[in-house]
Every structure is written in structure tokens, then in C-alpha cells.
Swiss-Prot record:
Protein name: Meiosis-specific APC/C activator protein AMA1
Comment on protein domains: The C-box is required for the association with the APC/C complex.
WD repeats: 226-264, 271-310, 323-364, 388-427, 432-474, 525-564
Subunit structure: Interacts with CDC16.
Pfam family, one: WD40_CDC20-Fz
Family: Belongs to the WD repeat CDC20/Fizzy family.
Disordered: annotated segments: 1-26, 94-125
Source organism phylogeny: Eukaryota, Fungi, Dikarya, Ascomycota, Saccharomycotina
Keyword Cell division: yes
Length: 593
């Protein structure tokens, strides 16, 4: 037998004739499959309600050689379940099942099959049933029906099809009796129902509790962004929603309306052989600070660049030079008060407190207008300085009440200071790590909870009770912890990572607290490194600086949840004694001895 033609889709309005190589017209057989194989045999459209008692199945299974032989297709025509469609036949169920000659042949064959089937033992019947199920004769998605099916089969097929409909598959699986089916068919139905229940359409209908995104919603180019773990070169303004970026010797502000605006020209610091190491917006006004490698602190006002008519003068409002000439690594602002204050951490381990104050220069013979302008001048005043770490200060953080200061250093520790008296700070605890500590964050909704993260030789996030210095919990990560940010709306914390797994690098991980389970991971196909990160003014997104000279924005939360002021519930500190000290009532009545 020659190799069969590929099957064609039936069209009652077009001719089914085909011209062979000799020029003669031949009838196209629609039901001959594409290839002679077991898969082709299984894909043949069979009866929707095929009953194995009417089939001419052999008591012994056919050999693989028979399935792959051309004679198999000749014998398939005589089984009574296969009929070619000629050009004279109309495509209807009545015409297919009403060919008189083939009808008699199939009827006689079916009656003989019934008589033979009634003589079979139970084991032989089960064997035939399993063979029919394995070949797919009773799958519910048949295309053609050549003979009338019984009511019992129709009810069973209806129940199975309902499982794949819009209803709940879990409810149908609980009510449908799969013991009446063979193991292969039961597995088929369950697998398809599970796939249906886990389809994207059903997942879209489920309301999401938070926005999960594995890709940034905005990426900004940042050429000359220094790949430095100890620098903090991005800041996000809470008052103007602008982003401040330090690029080498230059500083830029990016806004959605104006785009990138140059703040500090490259020439200003390059002539002094200096560069930018730290930038920070004041959280409650328009001031911002730029720190440099040689201890310069530059004070700017955003109004001078966006609300002033003279935008060509890009000079800082005030410049302060430290006596140590050491680099400014990090900066932390106090809460709003009568005086605008902030701490800076330096390369020599010092922590200095600065104030922004008005400057008055009463000079004679000045006009009234000039005198009023000079009275509005502002400047920086050094309040106090003390040695906080033995080596370079890497990170710094203030608690909510501004009476505790956490300082992370390159000496593999974080020191906790009581600054109730700003003139006489007292060291309370030294919190150890195995590498430099840059990532430090006080919890905004649990006042005595502090999180710290270690460098590349530590790679651990630790949680401390600040009143006692107790280590509450810790979790090991896959990379160098470069920043920690608490969520203001959820009991969650975000960690960003630097050096870590080069084959499968993780940039960001969102953890729940206190369970510390991973809720979201942002991975990168390339070995990227996050240098630092800041939270958005809306507390829904974070902005990260990476070593590929880009600034990336990730949305992690939504604004449906309200900002949490304070949480006083059991489990936050993981200790009954500490929770008792914090005034948290436990759900169980246990005596503390």
C-alpha cells in the first residue's frame, strides 16, 4: 500500500478530488492520519459513546509491528468504526450511518461481537476495557458519532464534561464516583480538572492582596554611577516626588515633568579632585544634602531649581568642610521640629550632628531690600561629633521617637546609642555581625524592633530587641545585604542584595514578619548587584541603584491598606518575657517564673 496522503479538513461545498502524479483524479480520504504510528492511531476520531462490547477487539493485544504496518489501515476499514467520505456523500450523521451495504456488514459484525463478548470471563472483559481506555476510545472530546449511544454513557460523559465547564472542579471531583473508571481514565480526568482549576482565567478572577511584579515599571539610565558598596547615591523626596542621583562628580534631579535636571556640574568637584559619595532629601521640606569624598557637605534647596526664574546659577546654598576631610558615607534626618537636624556618618567612624539655621549678617550702609534678603540666608552649624565605630560608618538609622541611634560600621558590628541627651550620647549595645553592616532599619510600627544586615562574608538579616539588645531572630540570605526597608502598610520587610550567587542572582526579596517567609523575589538573568535602595513617598514602591548604571523602580505594595501606626500583638518579638515588657498581652495564660 502506498504512503497515504495527509488528511484535509472537510468542506461540503468544495470537491474532495485530488489529482495524483499520473493525472488521474483520486478521492481524498479525510480520515487517514498524517503518519503511521501509535499516536496517529490514538488521534483517529472515534465514537463519542463507544461501547467496547460492540467492538471487535482481539483477546490478545496487537503487536507493535502490526500497528506500524500498512496493512493495519486496510484492516481498519473493516472494523465497522471507520468509513471514508466520498465526493457523492453529504456530510450528515444520517448519510454516514445509512450506507446499506456497509450497514449490514457492521450490523452482522456487531451481533457476532455481542455473542462473543457475552461468553468472555470477567478478567477478559476487564482486559478489553483497559485496552479500549488506553487507546482513547472513551475520551469525552470525540468529533463524530456514528451510532446511537446508550443513556448510561451519555450521563457519564455529561458529568465528565461538566467538570471541565465553568463550575467548580473540586465540587465535581468530590461527587463523581471515579471508582467506576479505570485508573488511567481517572488520572486523565483528575489531571485535566486540576489544569482547568489552575488556569490563568481563574487566577485573574481572584483578587490580588498586593501588587507582585518581577520586573521594574521604570528604568532610568545613570551613566557614571559608581559601583561602591559604601556610597549612598539615590534619594526620593517625600515633598516633591523627585529622585536625586549622584553620578561621579555630578548630581541630577529627575522629575516626571522636567526630566533630568543638573544640580551640581561636573567641573565643580572635578577641579577639586573630589566626588559625590552621599545624597539625601530632607523628608519634610525642600532641602537636600550632597556629601563628598573629602568631607564637603553641600546644602541645596529644590526651590532654587524649579521655582526660581534664575535657573542658571546652580551654586549650593551653603558648603561646610569637615575638619577630618574624610568622606561622608551616609545621612539620617531627624523628625520635624523647631530646628532642622541630621546626622552624618564619616569614613573615620565619627558621627556628627548638624543643624540648618538662619544666618544674620548685620552690615551697615546696605539697602533695606538687601538686608531682608541676607536675613533669610541659611547655613549649616555643627552641633556635636563623637566616635561611634572603630572603622568607617556604613549605615545609620533613627528610631521613631528619635531617642535611639543605630550605627553600622565596617568593623563588623552595629552600635546602639541612647541620644536622649544630644550632648551626651550613651552607647547601649554592640550588635555583632561577621561583615560590614550597611543595612539598618528601625521598624516603624514596632518601636523596639531593629533589623540589621551583614555584608558579603555574613549575608544574614538579624532582628533585635532594642531595649535589651536581645537577638530575636535571624535569616541567612544568598547575598550581601545592601539595604533593608520596612513596609508601612504590611508586616513585611524588603531586602536588597549585592554580591551573591553569580549564576542565579537575587536582587530583591520581600519577607513576611515574624514568619520570615519569602513573598516575592526579583531575580536577574545577569550578575547584577544592588548598591542601595530607598522607599517611595507613597510607601508602595522602592527605587534601587544597580551596578549596571541604571536606576530601577519596583512596585511591591498597593494603597488599599492603611498605614500602620503601631502593632501590639503577640508573636512580634517571639518571646513572652519581652512581649510582657513591651505591654503586649499574650493569648494564653502562662505564668512567667
Amino acid at each position: 500500500m502506498a504512503t497515504p496522503h495527509l488528511y484535509h479538513r472537510y468542506n461540503s461545498k468544495s470537491s474532495n478530488k485530488n489529482i495524483n502524479s499520473s493525472g488521474n483524479s483520486t478521492e481524498v480520504d479525510r480520515f487517514i492520519p498524517k503518519s503511521v504510528s501509535r499516536n496517529a492511531y490514538k488521534s483517529i476520531p472515534m465514537l463519542n459513546g463507544f461501547d467496547i462490547s460492540y467492538s471487535e477487539l482481539c483477546e490478545k493485544s496487537p503487536s507493535p509491528e502490526r500497528l506500524s504496518s500498512p496493512e493495519f489501515f486496510n484492516e481498519l476499514r473493516n472494523t465497522g468504526h471507520y468509513e471514508s467520505i466520498s465526493t457523492t456523500n453529504e456530510f450528515s450523521m444520517s448519510s454516514i450511518s445509512s450506507s446499506s451495504e456497509s450497514q449490514v456488514t457492521r450490523s452482522g459484525s456487531a451481533r457476532a461481537s455481542r455473542n462473543d463478548y457475552s461468553k468472555l470471563t470477567k478478567e477478559q472483559k476487564d482486559h478489553r476495557k483497559n485496552i479500549a481506555h488506553s487507546l482513547g476510545f472513551q475520551l469525552p472530546d470525540r468529533v463524530f458519532t456514528f451510532e446511537t449511544t446508550s443513556a448510561e454513557i451519555l450521563e457519564k460523559n455529561k458529568a465528565i464534561k461538566n467538570c471541565f465547564g465553568p463550575g467548580s472542579c473540586a465540587e465535581i471531583r468530590s461527587t463523581f464516583d471515579f471508582s467506576t473508571l479505570s485508573p488511567d481514565v481517572a488520572r486523565y480526568y483528575i489531571a485535566n480538572s486540576n489544569a482547568r482549576s489552575a488556569s490563568p482565567q481563574r487566577q485573574i478572577q481572584r483578587p490580588a492582596k498586593r501588587v507582585k511584579s518581577h520586573i521594574p515599571y521604570r528604568v532610568l539610565d545613570a551613566p557614571c554611577l559608581r559601583n561602591d558598596f559604601y556610597s549612598n547615591l539615590i534619594s526620593w523626596s517625600r515633598t516633591t516626588n523627585n529622585v536625586l542621583v549622584g553620578l561621579g562628580c555630578s548630581v541630577y534631579i529627575w522629575s516626571e515633568k522636567e526630566g533630568a535636571v543638573s544640580i551640581l556640574d561636573h567641573q565643580y568637584l572635578s577641579e577639586k579632585r573630589d566626588l559625590v559619595t552621599c545624597v539625601s532629601f530632607c523628608p519634610y521640606n525642600t532641602y537636600f544634602i550632597v556629601g563628598t569624598k573629602f568631607g564637603r557637605i553641600l546644602l541645596y534647596d529644590q526651590k532654587e531649581f524649579f521655582h526660581s526664574s534664575n535657573t542658571n546659577e546652580k551654586e549650593p546654598v551653603f558648603v561646610f568642610q569637615t575638619e577630618s576631610f574624610k568622606g561622608i558615607c551616609c545621612l539620617e534626618w531627624f523628625k520635624p521640629g523647631e530646628i532642622c537636624k541630621f546626622y552624618v556618618g564619616e569614613e573615620n567612624g565619627n558621627v556628627s550632628l548638624f543643624e540648618i539655621k538662619s544666618l544674620h549678617f548685620p552690615i551697615k550702609n546696605w539697602s533695606k531690600r538687601q538686608k531682608l534678603e541676607d536675613e533669610n540666608l541659611i547655613g549649616l552649624k555643627l552641633h556635636s561629633t563623637y566616635q561611634a565605630q572603630a572603622q568607617q560608618v556604613c549605615g545609620i538609622s533613627l528610631n521613631e521617637h528619635a531617642n535611639l541611634l543605630a550605627v553600622g560600621g565596617n568593623d563588623n558590628s552595629c552600635s546602639l546609642w541612647d541620644i536622649s541627651d544630644l550632648d551626651k550620647p550613651i552607647k547601649k549595645f554592640v550588635l555583632p555581625h561577621k561583615a560590614a553592616v550597611k543595612a539598618i532599619a528601625f521598624c516603624p510600627w514596632s518601636k523596639s524592633l531593629l533589623a540589621t544586615g551583614g555584608g558579603s562574608k555574613d549575608r544574614c538579616i538579624k532582628f533585635w530587641h532594642t531595649s535589651t539588645g536581645t537577638l530575636l531572630d535571624e535569616i541567612c540570605t544568598s547575598g550581601q545585604v545592601t539595604s533593608l526597608i520596612w513596609s508601612l502598610r504590611h508586616k513585611q520587610i524588603v531586602a536588597t542584595f549585592g554580591f551573591g550567587d553569580t549564576k542565579n542572582p537575587v536582587l530583591i526579596t520581600l519577607y513576611s514578619y515574624p514568619k520570615l517567609s519569602k513573598l516575592l523575589e526579583v531575580r536577574s538573568p545577569n550578575p547584577l548587584r544592588v548598591l542601595s535602595a530607598v522607599i517611595s513617598p507613597s510607601s508602595m514602591a522602592i527605587c534601587v541603584a544597580t551596578n549596571d548604571e541604571t536606576i530601577r523602580f519596583y512596585e511591591l505594595w498597593n494603597d488599599k491598606e492603611e498605614i500602620i501606626n503601631e502593632i501590639q500583638e503577640s508573636g512580634i518579638y517571639g518571646s513572652n518575657i519581652i512581649e510582657y515588657m513591651e505591654g503586649i498581652e499574650t493569648t494564653h495564660n502562662k505564668r512567667i517564673r
